[in-house]
């Protein structure tokens, strides 16, 4: 069985096709078909391991699902048949968050983030570039950057997800973000887009909050990155 560290090294060497190449290396069959109400699952049987992906999902979403299911296998965390990526991304379950972190590492190795984001602050255009380079969604790219905030020089970082103008959830390792505050910042950022907003942080120093929006008008969804 491939170890976690071996898997991460292999994914980095095969970027941006790490998860696909890793599944092949591990002898896992990846199948795509129409699934109702879920993005995919992994099943082990007498004939081997099969990862099923929803063929109706966008390619970036299928790639994250593949990496997520590989994470379940590598971390030996039981999977739930019929998982929705929307649910697992906002989950507070520790094991699911560990799986999501590993999925991000397989999709976007730290070396790639450092190379494409050589300086801070990180703004929407940089996240879009990172997402395209890694063949992932802007949301996946933003979450990966949040995980690596300290490593790339960000004191704080958070990603907040909106549907229309309605707050859905947020993820941060360092910030406690209230819905009311996030919604206020989001509305301010919408008025300034495509430029980021810069506001005083309210601390007793000269630090500022920098935030910007990546919109998906087709699905009426927005990834809001705050630092």
Outline where the language-model segments fall:
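Active-site hotspot residues in diverse enzymes, especially metal/ion-binding acidic/histidine motifs
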Residues: 1-227
């Amino acid at each position: 069985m491939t170890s976690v560290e071996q898997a991460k090294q292999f994914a980095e060497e095969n970027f941006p096709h790490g998860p696909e190449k890793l599944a092949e290396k591990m002898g896992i069959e990846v199948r795509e078909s129409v699934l109702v109400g879920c993005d995919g699952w992994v099943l082990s049987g007498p004939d081997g391991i099969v990862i099923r992906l929803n063929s109706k999902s966008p390619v970036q979403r299928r790639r994250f699902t593949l990496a997520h299911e590989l994470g379940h296998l590598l971390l030996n965390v039981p999977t739930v048949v019929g998982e929705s990526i929307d649910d697992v991304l906002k989950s507070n379950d520790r094991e699911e968050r560990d799986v999501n972190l590993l999925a991000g590492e397989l999709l976007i190795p730290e070396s790639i983030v450092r190379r494409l984001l050589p300086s801070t602050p990180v703004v929407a255009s940089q996240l879009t570039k990172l997402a395209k380079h890694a063949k992932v969604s802007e949301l996946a790219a933003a979450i990966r950057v949040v995980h690596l905030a300290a490593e790339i020089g960000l004191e704080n970082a958070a990603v907040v997800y909106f549907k229309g103008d309605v707050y859905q959830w947020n993820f941060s390792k360092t910030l406690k973000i209230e819905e009311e505050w996030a919604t206020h910042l989001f509305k301010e950022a919408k008025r300034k887009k495509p430029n980021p907003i810069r506001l005083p942080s309210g601390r007793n120093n000269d630090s500022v909050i920098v935030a910007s929006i990546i919109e998906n008008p087709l699905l009426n969804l927005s990834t809001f990155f705050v630092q």
